[in-house]
Amino acid sequence: MNGAKLCIQGVEKFFLHAGTRVEILKKTTVLFQQGMSYAIMGASGVGKSTLMHILSGLELPSAGSVLFNGHTISELAADEKFVFLNQSIGLVFQQPYLIRELSVLENVMVPGLLSGQSSAECKDRAQELLVQVDLASKRTSKVSTLSGGQQQRVALARALFNRPQFLLADEPTGSLDFNTGKLIVELLCKFQQEYGMGIIVSTHDMHVASAMNQIYYLEDGYLVLQPA
C-alpha cells in the first residue's frame, strides 16, 4: 500500500514503582498505514494514552523505536521533529487544549502561523475548516464560551490545518455525551476519506472503535489485532 507509514518496532514501556518494574507495553511491533483507520481499545489505565504519546513522539519508549517513513522519530533533528509534529501528524486529545484567550478562528490558525504561512493564508484555511466542522458562525467567539463538543471540533479543525498524513486522537469522545461523540466520530470518518490520511484512535467505546477499519486491543502490555 502506498502512502506514509508509522511503525512501532519492538517497543517496550515500563516504569519503576517502589522498586518494582511495571510494564505498560511488552515488545510491541505494529505498522500503521496512511489511508487506513485504527482503533486501540482497552480499559482505563491500561496504557492507551502512553502508547499514543509514544506514537506521536511526545514520549520516548523504554526500548524499541517509532519510525515514520523509515526514520526513527527520536533521532530526527530539531527542525525535522517540528515538521513531524506540526505537519506530518495531527493530534487531538480528550481535553482540547485550546488557547482560551483567543477566538475560535485564531486557535485554528495556530499551526499555519507556526509553519510560516501568511496570516491571510491561515485565515482562509481556518475559515474553510470551520465551515467543514459547522462552526463558521462561531469564528469570532472566544473558545471559552463554547460547549465541550464545540471545543473538540475546534481542536479537530486545528489538527487538520496542515493536512497531516496521520491523525492521532486520544479518547476524543471520552468527555462527551453520546450524540456529541457520535458527531466527532462522523467527522473523523469524513476527514479520513477526504484527506486520505491514517487515523489512530484510542478509545474504550465500541461505537467509536467499530467505525475504524481495524481494531487493536491493549491488554497485559500486548497489542492484539481483533480478527476481521
Features from the language model and the residues they span:
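Catalytic Walker B motif of ABC-type/P-loop ATPase nucleotide-binding domains
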Residues: 167-170
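Short coil-to-helix segment of the ABC ATPase nucleotide-binding domain corresponding to the Q-loop/switch region
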Residues: 102-111
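Conserved ABC ATPase signature
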Residues: 142-146, 150
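Conserved signature/switch motifs of ABC ATPase nucleotide-binding domains
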Residues: 86, 141, 161-162
